[in-house]
UniProtKB/Swiss-Prot annotation:
One of its GO terms (molecular function) is olfactory receptor activity. One of its GO terms (biological process) is detection of chemical stimulus involved in sensory perception of smell. Odorant receptor. InterPro entries: GPCR_Rhodpsn, GPCR_Rhodpsn_7TM, Olfact_rcpt. The keyword Glycoprotein applies. Its main location: membrane. It comes from Homo sapiens (Human). This is Olfactory receptor 2A1/2A42. The gene is OR2A1. It is found in: Cell membrane.
């Protein structure tokens, strides 16, 4: 790190620039969402681990998605809740870099996991006879580990580039956590290399994965329409539509934040988009999968039935 960079030992997170009453209202509301996120994704993990009927590649990837959602929420929301109670709460430089790394790592990994889930559905519906041969447990574990590794390595590259920059001027981050773009605005040097790497990452993670998902689901839709059984067609539509809802919410909010012209979205509006990306999406994901997925609802009924009989 540069000589001047050591002058900044902590940052101030400004959070939401609102009145005290509104901040207390948001604290209560966001606390409920936070609890629902942990309980909902925790329930998904519990059902998948306890019900042997859900020990399939599809739910293996879903369990990883639930882990990402829990981890992402734990990384950002407690800091946001603390800022609502105590505005302009400081965070150490090391803590800020750690939060940035984890945020990017979980976000990148979720992008890749959503692609893996769409590929799993593509193989299951378009090549059902070869499904067990293609989607072996060895393949699934390798793909999941690869998604986590790629996400972590790229996040590490971002943080290493940030550590090369001097931070000796303003130390107020106009956000509720150490989001990478907000941190870069405080650097006392040219950040063109950081911006190039961020743009390349956006192309790789926010253009490539949605394109692959759309290609997969175009084949899936064609295959579903050829299914003769009405029950089979309904089950396939139910499973795939839940995944498409999650994909649309996640990538839609991420693309608006990182790829839309910044002049159209002021900083305060960017914070609202980040709420959808890092807060509401993890809350909605278990609801979408439980309400629109018959197998998950069946597993929940069986689990509740065992509890009532015990």
């Amino acid at each position: 790190m540069g000589e001047n960079q050591t002058m900044v030992t902590e940052f101030l997170l400004l959070g939401f620039l609102l009145g005290p009453r509104i901040q207390m209202l948001l604290f209560g509301l966001f606390s409920l969402f936070y609890i629902f996120t942990l309980l909902g994704n925790g329930a998904i993990l519990g059902l998948i681990s306890l019900d042997s009927r859900l020990h399939t590649p599809m739910y293996f990837f879903l369990s990883h998605l639930a882990v990402v959602d829990i981890a992402y929420t734990r990384n950002t929301v407690p800091q946001m809740l603390a800022n609502l109670l105590h505005p302009a709460k400081p965070i150490s430089f090391a803590g800020c870099m750690t939060q940035t790394f984890l945020c990017l790592s979980f976000g990148h990994s979720e992008c890749l996991l959503l692609v893996l889930m769409s590929y799993d559905r593509y193989v299951a519906i378009c090549h059902p006879l070869r499904y067990s041969v293609i989607m072996t447990w060895r393949v699934c574990i390798t793909l999941a580990v690869t998604s986590w590794t790629c996400g972590s390595l790229l996040a590490l590259a971002h943080v290493v580039l940030i550590l090369r920059l001097p931070f000796s001027g303003p130390h107020e981050i106009n956000h509720f956590f150490c989001e990478i773009l907000s941190v870069l605005r405080l650097a006392c040097a040219d950040t063109w290399l950081n911006q190039v790497v961020i743009f390349a990452a956006c192309v790789f993670f926010l253009v490539g994965p949605p394109s692959l998902v759309l290609v997969s689901y175009s084949h899936i839709l064609a295959a579903i329409l050829r299914i003769q059984s009405g029950e089979g067609r309904r089950k396939a539509f139910s499973t795939c539509s839940s995944h498409l809802c999650v994909v649309g919410l996640f990538f839609g909010s991420a693309i608006i934040m990182y790829m839309a012209p910044k002049s159209r979205h002021p900083e305060e509006q960017q914070k609202v988009f980040f709420l959808f990306y890092s807060f509401f999406n993890p809350t909605l994901n278990p609801l979408i999968y439980s309400l629109r997925n018959g197998e998950v609802k069946g597993a929940l009924r069986r689990a509740l039935g065992k509890e009532s009989h015990s």
